[in-house]
Structures are given as structure tokens and as C-alpha cells.
Amino acid sequence: MASALSNASRRGVAVRLAFNVDHANPIPVPPPPGGEPSVIDGLDVPTKPIPGVPDLMHHKYVVRDGEAVWTGSTNWTDDSWSREENVIAVVESTGVAHSYSTDFEQLWSTGDVAQSGFVDPNPIKVDGKRVRAWFAPGRGEAMAIRIAHRVARAKTRIRVSSPVLTSAPILGALAEAVSDGKVDIAGVVDATQMKGVYHQWMLNGNSDWKVPLIARVLGGAPFSGKLSTPYGQGDVHDYMHAKVTVADDIVFIGSYNLSHSGEVNAENVLEIRDAELADRLAAFVDEIRARYPAAPLPA
């Protein structure tokens, strides 16, 4: 990837790279990606470090020539490509590219996560399909509520793939759907990271009210959990990292973990109404969850 960026610059392409900068605060759950400073420093392109304080610059997207967007859950690290479950979406649309370019300019001009994501999620037609681009933190709360709304309105199926699951509106919608028992619901999380979430909840006591919700969701529907390697410098990073929600024929795909903290990170999500794509991604979620045992429940 580094070579591709440098080669594009040498061809005369205007390349800019914004990236998250680590900080000394406690490691969040899920943990941020680990970049290689020497690789970034060696790039022959303008770069912009975005301080991940207090909230992460968590995007993984590219805008090409104002015509296409490459996005999803995949960090640009070796382990992301070889050891983790991830998703990538490529959208050829000037309208979608404009939305992503607007978000990028907000980050680039301010260098501040909190000043980005203020992009209206207006519907855009792409090959006859309706697409909306959501960004956080500017539209983070609305983004989570939108996903929860679609989950609550689902009539036939819900599929979820997310390293963690802590967003209150989404948890509430899932718990209600599981309790109603009218919709085919299944999903997959990262077991190690969910155990970390439970530990944090136990220590701070501020999220005790979420415990029955997550227990209802993970215990009442077939959710699996990948027992990944715990986070640590130099360790293997093999998380279950795909971020996908399918509600009937609507897909949400991007960088956003279904977490409360994700609402204030720099994040992006594509909402796509496409029955064929929904079938494909629902099958992908089922393929992942078939690999792993049942997700852990809070003690």
C-alpha cells in the first residue's frame, strides 16, 4: 500500500494521507490499529497526523479522482489483510465521492476529530440503488439511531458482525427483536474484546444497565465469538474485525463498531439498499460465525 501511494505521487497524482496518532491514554475496546511510523515517514506524499485524543481517527477510506470510494473495516496493516475478518466496499459514484471528500477536508483542515463528520447523509442513486454515506462524530448519534431503526423495522432477517456490541439504541433494538422472536437473527463478535467490555463495565459500574440487554441478544440468538489474541504491542492482531449489519435488504458497512464510543470517533458507514448485496453479506456473516463457538455472556 505504501508503495502504491508513493508510485501514484510520482505519476503526478495529488495524494494526501491522514492517519491516527497513538496516545498514552488507556487502550480502548476495541483497540486502535497499529501503524508503522517509519513507513509513514518514508512516504513521498503530504501526511497529516490526527491525534486520537480523546476520540480515534478510525476511518479506512480512499477517494480516487472524485469518482470512486474504497472503504470498509480494513486497516492498512499486514495482520488486517492476513489474520482478520474484514470487509471492503468499492463504490463508483461522484456523489458518494463528494461526501467522503467533504469529510476528508474537514479532518485535513482542522486536524481535529471533533470538527469532522458534518456531512448530510442525503440519498444518492448508484446503479439504481439508494446509498447514504454516514459520518461520525458529526452525525454519529444519528448514525447509530439509523442502524437501530432499521433493525427495529426488519421483518425477515437481521445479521450482525461487529467486534463489540455496546451501542444502547442498537442493543435495545436487537434485544427487542430477539424477544419478539419474529425475525431470523444471528451474528458474530470478537469474544476477547467482549470479555474486555464486560470487565470495563464491572469496574466502572456506569453501564450495568446494558448487561441484561447484551445477555438477551447474545444468549437469545445464535451469536458466535472469535477468541482472538489479546491486544498488546508486538502481539499478533487477529481480531474478528468485520463491521456489517444487514436488516432485510438494507446493508450497513464501514469502519464503525456498534459501540457508544464509535459515535464520537471519526467513522464512516455506507447504508445501501440492495437485496443481492444483502444476501451476499448475510451469507458472509453466517460463514464467519460458523467458524467460532457461542459468544461469551456477561457473568
Question: In which residue ranges do the predicted regions lie?
Answer:
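Long, repeat-rich segments with strong aromatic
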Residues: 155, 162-165
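Active-site cores of enzymes that catalyze phosphoryl transfer or operate on phosphate-rich substrates
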Residues: 109-138
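Extracellular/periplasmic Venus flytrap/periplasmic-binding protein
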Residues: 130-153
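PLD/PLD-like phosphodiesterase catalytic module centered on the HKD motif
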Residues: 2-69, 74, 78-83, 90-109, ...
